[in-house]
Amino acid sequence: MLFNKCIIISINLDFSNKEKCMTKPYSIGLDIGTNSVGWAVITDNYKVPSKKMKVLGNTSKKYIKKNLLGVLLFDSGITAEGRRLKRTARRRYTRRRNRILYLQEIFSTEMATLDDAFFQRLDDSFLVPDDKRDSKYPIFGNLVEEKVYHDEFPTIYHLRKYLADSTKKADLRLVYLALAHMIKYRGHFLIEGEFNSKNNDIQKNFQDFLDTYNAIFESDLSLENSKQLEEIVKDKISKLEKKDRILKLFPGEKNSGIFSEFLKLIVGNQADFRKCFNLDEKASLHFSKESYDEDLETLLGYIGDDYSDVFLKAKKLYDAILLSGFLTVTDNETEAPLSSAMIKRYNEHKEDLALLKEYIRNISLKTYNEVFKDDTKNGYAGYIDGKTNQEDFYVYLKNLLAEFEGADYFLEKIDREDFLRKQRTFDNGSIPYQIHLQEMRAILDKQAKFYPFLAKNKERIEKILTFRIPYYVGPLARGNSDFAWSIRKRNEKITPWNFEDVIDKESSAEAFINRMTSFDLYLPEEKVLPKHSLLYETFNVYNELTKVRFIAESMRDYQFLDSKQKKDIVRLYFKDKRKVTDKDIIEYLHAIYGYDGIELKGIEKQFNSSLSTYHDLLNIINDKEFLDDSSNEAIIEEIIHTLTIFEDREMIKQRLSKFENIFDKSVLKKLSRRHYTGWGKLSAKLINGIRDEKSGNTILDYLIDDGISNRNFMQLIHDDALSFKKKIQKAQIIGDEDKGNIKEVVKSLPGSPAIKKGILQSIKIVDELVKVMGGRKPESIVVEMARENQYTNQGKSNSQQRLKRLEKSLKELGSKILKENIPAKLSKIDNNALQNDRLYLYYLQNGKDMYTGDDLDIDRLSNYDIDHIIPQAFLKDNSIDNKVLVSSASNRGKSDDFPSLEVVKKRKTFWYQLLKSKLISQRKFDNLTKAERGGLLPEDKAGFIQRQLVETRQITKHVARLLDEKFNNKKDENNRAVRTVKIITLKSTLVSQFRKDFELYKVREINDFHHAHDAYLNAVIASALLKKYPKLEPEFVYGDYPKYNSFRERKSATEKVYFYSNIMNIFKKSISLADGRVIERPLIEVNEETGESVWNKESDLATVRRVLSYPQVNVVKKVEEQNHGLDRGKPKGLFNANLSSKPKPNSNENLVGAKEYLDPKKYGGYAGISNSFAVLVKGTIEKGAKKKITNVLEFQGISILDRINYRKDKLNFLLEKGYKDIELIIELPKYSLFELSDGSRRMLASILSTNNKRGEIHKGNQIFLSQKFVKLLYHAKRISNTINENHRKYVENHKKEFEELFYYILEFNENYVGAKKNGKLLNSAFQSWQNHSIDELCSSFIGPTGSERKGLFELTSRGSAADFEFLGVKIPRYRDYTPSSLLKDATLIHQSVTGLYETRIDLAKLGEG
């Protein structure tokens, strides 16, 4: 074989050809997203340069001229959650197996004398008969004894009870089976210390719940006869009846109240806390649901962690009630109450099953067969086979039995959830390990009389069951594990019996602390505080208090609380009660200062923050003086830190023992039982460590006393007059040792893996662009970062909340307008209709003009104005809070800023009614009535506008910092950075506004160019602004600080307002003011100091339009080896998670064995093998029965599983696949790009490792449309989500253009997509296009409004093919791309990260030379 001639190519080549140095200055624009980075290079005249780029490879093409404009696309980064869950499960199963092996080790000698093949038979019990090493009967090795055993002990619990209660000598094999079952399924460890079935105290748990409930909800519920409650929960009645009976024990509590919802949870029903906490959406919780923890976390995200304790106590009570149900048995003498309960459940199941079978047999044979024989239904056959869960089985039975008489017995038991219960159910999770231990001890005590080794090893056997590795010690892996941190005293194998001697628990706990605590977002070297740190809670309280304002009778305007008032409120209220309300503040201001008619702002009913930890510690320590003494702060913080980090009571006691000279034992005992969860986002150093250089104050000092400024945290850290901003930026500078490893630096940034991947790729792009420009650094780099998708429940449901809000608020107002006034074009009002702002505002304003009070005509809404309360010149706020619907914007009065004082006086009463009904917010009301308080101050206006321009998100600042330190690493004589490259961050709203002003429409569905276009526009806007106003640099350029007496300081507040509001106006020829006036601006904008031309409104705008019309944009899909597969678009592991049954005879199904030694043809295995990459192999194979040697050039998929073996010996791996005389191997990561001879492009997504004739091929061409079609599609996409007639009118006036567009797309399909059958289907469907409505035409071309579907562009868009509907005709997914199609006259193209460098390999020429 010609090994010496084989060439192996990994397409990861170094494009190191030296480029000619760029002589002109240039800038780079970046648009960073979670799965794309758009980039652009611009010169000082806003043009995008092009370069003749050299092409490597074996094709005749040596140079290609390319525009320096492009986009890198990549699969979004994912979290490690999936890996972590699998890793945790593997550890759990391994440790369970080890426990069984420890037990077998103890039994081995004695067992060998009785039955030396016993353990072997057990290990082989799941093997098919041919693979068993001994008898197929696992316990006794013969049929007779096996049958007797199963007759006597139908379940393992029958055996456990027998052994626990019997004084007779039992077969040692049976003793082992019982103990192994307990050790394998040993229960939870939530209850510490001794516990048995007789001290499962429901009454105590209920009192604990009541105490916590009373403390949190400031209630005084009590129950004199708690025995009565226990009787109710143990009674054989439905859960609903239990809840109702318990509620009657508390006469003052309503059935619709929050206490009632908690009772629902406690008895095992579902509760909904939406109304209780005044939430906009359903907040359902159910203790038995697998998603309970996740659901609770979501709810606490809305209502705050202060409520977590009451849910914890409710869950404990629920578990105690469940457990009491298990342990309630009639045999009081048994030492195995759990096993007795399970036997009772088994017997009831058997009896009820016989009754049910008899009952259903009388209905019909067909029904009987469906219920008991058809496992595809939710009947008994599916239920007992595990395919149907208990809940679905009960629903199925209830629907079936409800039609017939005489089924009351079954239905009542179903309502109690006590019908045909299995041995293993979800509520087994409420059984603590102590219950199993109780039965284990009973068995060991009885059988130790006959087997002395059991007495000798009793403690060791019990230790196997009771031992668990403390979570703070973590995984026990040795070496360089990424996931282990345990520290050892000795290097030997760890067992349950030597754990304390081998593991250094204290040191491991310290390592755990360091690992668990994350770093401050602002001071990356500092660890964050616990969420319940007293310092952190104090900071949050003052941060909230500092923005509270009040007004009272005889006062002209709202005023902030002063320092004394804030301190008083904290001392008198926050330290006196857990929840402080607006009424408390009003009471204080009235009682101390005598104010009347007080109204507050900055608080809604109650404060979000509290000093809950202060109250917890006060209850435990009972020493207010100690808590209030600032010298004890370090002690208190250390205690809270320990109670947050650790859950293990013993470790908490150990760490708190250092305070024995301060607190007595009872206090330390109570402290050890307290546990906190969660971490804050800030460190102690940030809150109360770093100091302002002038005043010497910390941030907390300023929050407590800031004179008349009353700045909150965000204002303090961004205020240029204070030194916090500078110190934070200094703390974020990367050390020299880190700069070389940019990947690790990005990895350490806060934020999701998705956004970090975008950041890393953007830095690579910048590096390559600098190389393309011959090494010359850019003048500036402009960064815009996309906001990540929010997957919170609130984010998902916002679009569905408008109708609910209106119904509730209009009812409060006493208006029937929602039912009585419906536009003629609509049959009903729904959430989709209310996405139209005009319609929504109409109802929010109760059908009135907001400024005049005149009635508005619901069928003429498009004729009215939407006025921005704060003009857009100051604030680009398009939220409903800043909009009103009016017959004319001029009706706001004489004021250019806000509704005039005259308007306010006339309309304030009406606005106040809307406020009280929650149809408008407090913020909206305040802005409407701003004229009463003098309108906007010039400083406010300047601040408004500045915030619209400058990006303030921390993650964007981190990116700017990375780029700044990369390019500006030289220092001057004062050790300050010399900035030769300006790193500029602008808000995305500027590009959006620019696009809107000049009709530069973005339609994402067409192609991927829009990412590059956004990057280009960012660079253009930033360049123009800084040319026009060079002294603006301190506002936009990272690392620059405004100097004293700077440009900003010299300008008066009024000048600043005018200046800021006109910034974006430099691009316009004229400006329309709110009062209707139009101001003309010069054609050419110049820098007033230098006279340099900055922006020519004709030629420069023409340049922008020309660039956005370039058909050549460098689009690159990042090639990657896959480390995980995909299952329905979601990440999966090496294969599908669930085992598949063994394949049918002669099946071609390929499965991975569940274990290496298990043949999947006998035992089944895992399907859906995930592929990592493919290789292109040139060699020979033997074909047919005659094994004819045939030359081949074909793909071979390499699975993630096989990747290691392939890397070890690539040639040998392929030889084992059947290849011979291998001449060439080309490695092809996912998304490798091929160009066919007709110009069509394909991306290789995957080749099946099990069948190299099958794979997934994606489309790779980008369709380009002229601006005429882009504009048509922009309006078409918006035609149905608004009553605004402009979109519809435009489409109606240009309807004919759809025909031209359709045939253009059809031609593109013919030339580049190749879905010719689909083309004929589409052509046939289009012949009747004139007969279809405008709405159907639009949704067919560009996809339905609010949908991610692309309509006709599903045919042309990059990526995998998808089916879609066009003018009522279903167009199937095009499936004709085959791996072999890429090998006919194809060129393999490897692109660099920008796509500017290419290596092209003509596959037809492989082997030539």
UniProtKB/Swiss-Prot annotation:
Positions with biased composition (Basic and acidic residues): 1121-1130
Keyword NADP: no
Matching Gene3D superfamilies: 1.10.30.50, Ribonuclease H-like superfamily/Ribonuclease H
Obligatory cofactor(s): Mg(2+)
Location of the active site: D31 (for ruvc-like nuclease domain), H868 (proton acceptor for hnh nuclease domain)
Binding site for Mg(2+) 1: D31, E784, E788
Use in biotech settings: The simplicity of the Cas9-gRNAs RNA-directed DNA endonuclease activity may be used to target and modify a DNA sequence of interest.
Effect of N882A: No longer prevents plasmid transformation
Family statement drawn from the similarity comment of this UniProt entry: Belongs to the CRISPR-associated protein Cas9 family. Subtype II-A subfamily.
Name of the featured protein: CRISPR-associated endonuclease Cas9
Species name: Streptococcus thermophilus
